[in-house]
């Protein structure tokens, strides 16, 4: 009786050990040694990916140089990360002559993201971005406070949208001068 229990216990333990080993992935390290590849649940990284998605959109959309093709290229890449609300904002700025003034004035615009706040308790995820814009002219620099809002929707990952989000309902809620100083 004891021997039978010991055999069944040993077989069961060996089976569970083998199952656990099958769930592990090993990677060959430059042809020399095996390393255990640690897998993570994709959902664990979602908050980090969301903030990086929003950060990347803002960098593409608000970093401008006095070059029409560079502006159009960045805006086109930003549109892969957002919906028509961002395109509508781009069209508004274009109709107001903003991009033409950047080009003709030989100005540059840089963005520095202070923080990205995402609410993951509701879906779509509410996002607020706090940033500073620097508009660099030949003789002066204008610093502006920028606050934007939007919502993130889960989307399919692609080469053009590696984080798998779409920024929707994008709007600028604050864009005011903080200071102007000479260069």
What is the meaning of each model-derived region?
Residues 1-25, 29-48, 69-183:
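Structured, amphipathic secondary-structure segments that form assembly/contact surfaces
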Residues 53-64:
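Solvent-exposed, amphipathic alpha-helical segments
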């Amino acid at each position: 009786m004891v021997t039978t229990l010991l055999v069944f216990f040993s077989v069961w333990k060996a089976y569970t050990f083998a199952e656990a080993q099958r769930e592990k992935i090993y990677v060959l390290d430059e042809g020399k040694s095996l390393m255990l590849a640690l897998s993570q649940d994709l959902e664990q990284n979602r908050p980090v990916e969301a903030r990086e998605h929003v950060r990347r959109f803002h960098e593409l959309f608000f970093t401008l140089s006095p070059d029409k093709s560079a502006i159009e290229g960045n805006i086109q890449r930003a549109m892969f990360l957002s919906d028509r609300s961002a395109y509508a904002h781009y069209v508004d700025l274009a109709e107001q002559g903003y991009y033409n003034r950047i080009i003709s004035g030989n100005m540059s615009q840089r963005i520095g993201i202070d923080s990205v706040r995402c609410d993951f308790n509701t879906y779509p995820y509410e996002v607020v971005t706090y940033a500073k814009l620097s508009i660099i002219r030949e003789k002066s620099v204008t610093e502006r406070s920028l606050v934007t809002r939007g919502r993130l929707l889960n989307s399919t990952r692609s080469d053009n949208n590696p984080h798998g989000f779409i920024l929707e309902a994008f709007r600028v809620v604050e864009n005011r001068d903080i200071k102007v100083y000479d260069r």
